[in-house]
Regions:
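C-terminal accessory extensions appended to soluble enzyme cores
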Residues: 6-16, 152-153, 229-263
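Inter-motif core of Ras-like GTPase G domains
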Residues: 121-147
């Protein structure tokens, strides 16, 4: 559970570390989802983020680290040939981040699995200082829903990652009238926002008649909006316009965080 005293101690510790290790200005960035609770919409947001980069003609490397989600619903289910599946449950942990950045695009989008917390935290504890010294920055994406467990998951990750990452929190409205009172009103969430100043974005509720077949067939909002698919039920004029509207507004939200998404 998130603790403001722990956070303050962590901030001092990591700030002191950076004063000893002179880190260059970031030239590369890893954007990773904070795992923990599954089914909150992490992959849905990462799909939109990948299309946002694509719309700006910014090259990225897509990594699917969700080893439990083997087929439908995984990042690879949507982008397949563009996505590399990585098993982080090895002694090397998240070293794949460093290797892919050294070989390719300056930005990595990493969709983490629900059980990735311990591996991620241990890797940051052992590798962060040396990796940061090479000019690599990190942005952690947290997804909150009306379920308090989604909020607790983010607070737990933040208590371990501390200020070694920048934070973007996405309020995912999974119902038509979503209630985010726990995220917005709980004392621990307020402490998190005060200490780490996350950029908070909104991902609006999507009609089930669009969202469900899109997941089933592995198609993105962009593919629906631009009619780049062969799924009859998603070619209805109303759903095409809906997809265009959802994507436009979500891109506008992502624009608010671009300072934490680019190197």
């Amino acid at each position: 559970m998130y603790d403001s005293n722990t956070a303050a101690t962590g901030e001092r510790k990591h700030s002191d570390s950076r004063s000893v290790v002179s880190s260059p200005a970031p030239s590369k960035r890893v954007i990773l989802t904070m795992g923990g609770k599954g089914g909150v919409g992490k992959t849905s947001f990462m799909l939109a983020l990948a299309e946002w980069f694509q719309s700006h003609e910014i090259p990225v490397t897509l990594l699917d680290l969700d080893t439990e989600n083997k087929s439908r619903g995984s990042l690879k289910h949507y982008f397949d040939g563009r996505v590399t599946k990585v098993n982080i449950h090895t002694a090397a942990g998240l070293d794949a981040f460093v290797d892919h950045l050294a070989e390719g695009a300056p930005i990595v989008l990493a969709d983490m699995g629900a059980s990735s917390g311990q591996v991620t935290h241990e890797w940051f504890d052992s590798m962060f200082e040396d990796v940061a010294a090479t000019g690599l920055a990190f942005t952690a994406i947290g997804i909150v829903t009306p379920d308090p467990a989604s909020v607790e998951s983010i607070l737990s990750w933040a208590a371990r990652l501390q200020d070694r990452v920048n934070y973007v929190v996405v309020e995912n409205a999974m119902t038509h009238q979503a209630d985010f009172s726990y995220w917005r009103g709980s004392e621990q969430a307020k402490q998190f926002r005060t200490v780490f100043q996350p950029v908070v974005l909104m991902m609006e509720f999507r009609l089930p008649e669009l969202e469900n077949p899109a997941r089933q067939h592995g198609v993105t909002l962009g593919q629906i909006a631009e009619r780049r698919l062969k799924v009859p039920e998603l070619q209805r004029a109303s759903l095409v316009i809906r997809a265009q509207s959802y994507r436009r507004r979500l891109f506008e939200e992502i624009d608010k965080a671009k300072g934490l998404l680019l190197p």
